[in-house]
Amino acid sequence: MRIISARSGAKSIIAEKTFTGTVHQDPVITDQDDIKINTVIFTPCSRTYWHFHDNGQILQVFRGKGYVCGKDGVPRVITEGDTVYIEPGERHWHGGTQDSLMGHTAITLGGTTWLEEVSEADYAAAADAD
């Protein structure tokens, strides 16, 4: 058993490399090969690049409204209280809506493979779904 203390006073990481827009990341567990837990805040219009996880991912939305888009290319709106399970190997992206930030806890199982940036057209399709 491990108890991970809160990051009292620690600054959030501004994630840039595989994200579009301003994304704040607070690592919870990052030192395990098989599981990573991050608290993430997406500002409006910010999002991940397309990516997939070896053993899947669980997103628990705790604030705001966002989008998640999977292999079918159909963006879905997610809101506070929603939980998303992303299958192992499923290509996807997630982020804030055009007018709302979105905060979630991401539990990532296994490794992550990052792909291309989400195009403005793909993101605009998400706004149409809203």
Locate the predicted segments by residue.
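A short, N-terminal "cap"/entry segment at the start of jelly-roll beta-barrel domains
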Residues: 1-35, 114-130
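Conserved strand-loop elements at the edges of beta-sheets that form or border functional pockets
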Residues: 30, 52, 60, 78-80, ...
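Conserved short histidine dyad/triad with adjacent acidic residue
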Residues: 38-53, 88
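Short beta-strand His + acidic residue motifs that chelate non-heme Fe in jelly-roll/DSBH
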Residues: 48-50, 68-69, 91-98
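Glycine- and acidic-residue-biased ligand/ion/polar-headgroup-sensing regions
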Residues: 54-67, 71-72
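A short hydrophobic beta-strand segment most commonly corresponding to one strand
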Residues: 58, 85, 99-117
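Short acidic-glycine-tyrosine-enriched beta hairpin
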Residues: 72-89
